[in-house]
Structures are given as structure tokens and as C-alpha cells.
Amino acid sequence: MTTELDRLRELLDADKAKLGIHIRKMNSPGTPVYRSLENVVPPGLILVASFAATMLVHFYLGAAILAAGCAWWLMRHLPQVKDGVFDRTAAMVLASEKQFDFWWSQGVLSLYAKLPDGSERAATRRQDWRAWVRDLPDGLETLPSGQMMQEQ
């Protein structure tokens, strides 16, 4: 007999359901997926380089380094951090029902599925995720590849 978590894993692997993760809650000190090297060291290096350039060369060079560093942080590094937090959290919560239950109760996780008839189902902390998984029909279809879900 398969458990609800096993069925959820199958649905997620087949892209028939989506797992939502509250990135900000999970990317904070104290959570098991937080990595301080990802979050503290890069901005620290940017600030040190900016201050050093300001003191040793000129204010404008320090400001340029700070602006370029902030742009790099926002456009390049932050999306990688978000993806890493999502991947680590998904692996952690899908590993055991105990972990899934705990993080579900904390409001970190959500579930979403689009049914073949076009209706959508979502579950958050207030709903029972096990009942949500059990209530999904067995013949849940995926969207054709390349087609985005759109509100009607």
C-alpha cells in the first residue's frame, strides 16, 4: 500500500502536481537548508571590495564596485540561492512524512494541481495535505509540453 507521500512524490515526478515552498522562511538562520556561505560571504566581499576601492583609489570606483556587486547579487546570485533553497527543501521534506508534516504545519509548504476538467486545486497550511492528495483523481493529466497554465 502506498502512502500519501509516495503518491505525492509520483505526482510531482510526473509534473501532475506542484510543490510550493516559502523561500524566505526557509532561507533564514536556524533552518536546516540555510547556508550562510551563500548569503553572507558574497555581500561581505562586495562591501569589502567597495570600501577598499573607496579608500585606496576614489569614491567613484567604490560606488561603481558596489553598484556592479549589487547588480550581480540580484541578477545572478540570488536566483541560484533561491533554486538551491527550493531543491534542498524539497529533498528534505519529501524524504520523510515526519519532515513533511512538520514543515507543512509551519506554513512553509503548499500544493497545487490543475485537473483535467480545467479546475484547479491548492492546499496550504490550513488544509490537510493527505486529504488533498487522496482527493486527486487517479487519471490526473499533465499539460501538453510547452503549454503554460493560464488563468481564464
Predicted regions and their residues:
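Cytosolic juxtamembrane N-terminal segments of multi-pass membrane proteins
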Residues: 1-37
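Polybasic, proline/glycine-rich intrinsically disordered low-complexity segments
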Residues: 10-18, 100, 110-152
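Short, amphipathic alpha-helical segments
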Residues: 31-59, 118, 123-142
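Short, isolated positions within intrinsically disordered regulatory regions of eukaryotic proteins
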Residues: 64, 76-77, 107-108, 133-136
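Generic structural signal of hydrophobic/aromatic residues within well-ordered alpha-helices
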Residues: 8, 51-52, 85, 89-90, ...
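Cytosolic juxtamembrane segments of membrane proteins
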Residues: 78-121
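Transmembrane alpha-helical hairpins and terminal membrane-anchor modules
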Residues: 39-88
